[in-house]
């Protein structure tokens, strides 16, 4: 009899926990943003691209985000503060892409600072808003945080490398849920694509109190000096990669610096998935379906640029 009571009691506990966990799961599912939209910041065109428009976004960044289940809004330059306010309230995160404009004086940098400041303020009031920086975007994050250009020359242009993981990477937001297989691939195989002449050295990071207190170093690499290749903020959903995960599946320039192995494609997928899942935590939304539709990058057609640039396709804007 006592045993029967124990069994019934055990089943009661199991049913209780199952019901509680089921309701918790459904709560999470109900509150997850299933239609995330991420902004990509445009930047000034170089002389090669100027005939197509005054600013551009490489299409590989768009595909990177779309591949993990989000849509894209181009964040164009030279817009009013009111327009940037409206865009910020409408999108669920922003990506600062790679490129070659000036960190201090470009319109790209000016607009990035607007969104960076808004993101800090929003996250401080528990309004989740992630930022992702790739290559120049990664460098720009260090500039916006420190107020200084602390980059050093590394000439790391056209290289693939494995990443040197730090102890801090093990409990990082970015890599914590990565399958062990992918983690080991990044650490042992040359699947990270580097196209940068400048980098933030670990020495300059260590000497700068603002950077030390704001960013956790997740990976480093060495070329001439040791530099930071992946980082994330301690308190904010802000992430930077000096390398180019979007190039692996979407850029086909004949270059030794772009890996196309199945392993490298897996790496890209898991990083894109991480970023989009961060955006799913944001509840920002457009004021109407029409406003949303009018803002999406679907309103623009990519141009094939693979015969004369490092990008296969790019979007251009006036």
Regions found by a protein language model. Give the residues of each.
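N-terminal beta1-alpha1 cap of cysteine-dependent amidohydrolase-like domains
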Residues: 2-236, 243-318
């Amino acid at each position: 009899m006592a045993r029967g009571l124990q069994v019934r009691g055990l089943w009661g506990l199991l049913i209780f926990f199952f019901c509680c966990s089921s309701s918790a799961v459904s709560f999470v599912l109900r509150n997850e943003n299933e239609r995330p939209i991420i902004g990509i910041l445009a930047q000034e065109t170089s002389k090669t691209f100027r005939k197509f428009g005054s600013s551009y976004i490489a299409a590989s960044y768009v595909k990177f985000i779309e591949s993990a289940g989000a849509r894209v809004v181009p964040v164009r330059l030279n817009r009013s503060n009111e327009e940037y306010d409206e865009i910020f309230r409408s999108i669920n995160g922003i990506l600062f892409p790679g490129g070659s404009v000036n960190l201090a004086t470009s319109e790209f940098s000016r607009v990035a600072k607007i969104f960076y400041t808004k993101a800090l303020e929003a996250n401080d009031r528990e309004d989740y808003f992630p930022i992702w920086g790739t290559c120049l975007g990664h460098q720009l994050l260090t500039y916006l945080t420190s107020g200084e250009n602390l980059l050093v020359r590394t000439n790391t242009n056209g290289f693939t490398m494995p990443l040197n993981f730090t102890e801090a990477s093990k409990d990082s937001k970015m890599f914590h849920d990565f399958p062990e297989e992918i983690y080991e691939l990044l650490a042992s195989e040359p699947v990270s694509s580097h196209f940068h002449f400048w980098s933030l050295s670990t020495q300059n990071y260590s000497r700068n109190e603002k950077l030390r207190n704001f960013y956790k170093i997740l990976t480093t690499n060495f070329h001439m000096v040791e530099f930071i290749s992946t980082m994330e903020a301690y308190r904010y959903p802000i992430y930077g990669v000096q390398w180019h995960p979007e190039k692996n599946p979407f850029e086909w320039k004949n270059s030794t610096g772009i890996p196309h192995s199945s392993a490298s494609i897996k790496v890209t997928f898991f990083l894109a998935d991480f970023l989009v899942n961060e955006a799913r935590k944001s509840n920002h939304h457009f004021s109407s379906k029409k406003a949303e539709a009018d803002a999406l990058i679907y309103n623009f057609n990519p141009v094939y640029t693979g015969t004369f640039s490092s990008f296969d396709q790019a979007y251009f804007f006036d």
